[in-house]
Amino acid sequence: MGVGRRSNIRAPAYMSSGPSYAQPVPAAYGSGMSQGTAASPFAGCVERPIRFVHRGRIAEVAGADTTRTLLDWLREDARCPGTKEGCAEGDCGACTVLVGERDAQAPGGVRFRNVNACIQLLPMLDGKALLTVEDLKPAAQACGAALHPAQQALVECHGSQCGFCTPGFVMSMVQVYERDRAAGTAPGRQQLADDLAGNLC
């Protein structure tokens, strides 16, 4: 199985502890969620339900095949087609989502990083949090905005062509925006190029 560049060499991303466009994952963790690791990928089916935070609540998936990808679950089971399948090898970035893990040192107590959903096995989400492109608008509206600033910038600057790769670019841009907003910094052109290197148009 191929290995995605971003999911292995990208520096950890941090979501802001202030008013954020991410769902309130720390609160959901407090309702019985653990930091447990997923079952072995060689076990056939996961013996206990997989639990992870999605859209501010704990999602539970029972009887999941250990070889099922997060992308397949999103598109086929959760009916969330916003996350696209491009290369299915972890190279094009069309399927980019953000996966969060508890981290007391991170703003808000959760550390998010970019992940290629096409090579992320579903059981690996156990005890974590998930943020997809379709989760951005409701969270933005809760903060009094129509879209996340990354989405709004793409609209205003005509940043899409056919649009198929756009959701992946958006999620990478969200990670950059939230990371730098929390740090009070602004990325330079070269930093942005590095951050978006895993997304192909």
Which role fits each region the language model picked out?
Residues 5-201:
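Signature of N-terminal electron-transfer/Fe-S-associated modules in redox systems
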Residues 1-3:
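Low-complexity, intrinsically disordered Ser/Thr/Pro- and acidic-rich segments
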